[in-house]
Amino acid sequence: MIKINYMSTLFVGIDVSSKSNVVYAMDFDENKYIDSTFSNNQPGADKLAEIIAECMQKHSHLNTIIVALESTSVYSIHIANFLSSCELLMPYKPYVYCLNPKMTANYRKSYVGMEKTDHMDAFLISDFARVGRTKKSEPWRGSQYLALKRLTRHRLHLAECITREKTYMVSNLYLKFSELQLLDDDNRPFSNIYGATSSAVLTEFMSLQ
């Protein structure tokens, strides 16, 4: 578990959408430092990083940054990648957490009658981090996460393709040699009906005769 001095940490909550990022930042004592909206693009991300850096420079008692945002489809990926690796913020050891929306939804229940707006959502996410709810989560590792995500999805795609081709082969095999599927393992001529030997024999010989 990462040890962070919460008393000297700036907690940044971001409500992400396709077009904009609504940002709310406060310290452990709930003093507000940022409450603004930025475009969800590179210029907007650069501007946000500049404002966070200026805030850290202005308030010398702050030396660490925790950024929390909900994992919102693909919209949160770029801003999470940028803030976790931004050179301007590196002196302040930024920790970026992409949260399951269910976690913040459950936390919202502790606020009775809170209205549902983008700015209130950003505040809620910031407060979620302030009270230590991110301690059990792992910080964002964008490049590693995306590489693993693409690899696992490609593996699933290949597995589904193989399953589909095997199903197609079995249906054709039944039409050509229906009894092969009914034989016991000891009586089967091939140890693997999907193997190279089986494929070669069944391709070369057009019938049982």
Question: Language-model features: where?
Answer:
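Phosphate- and other anionic-substrate recognition elements at nucleic-acid/protein interfaces
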Residues: 1-209
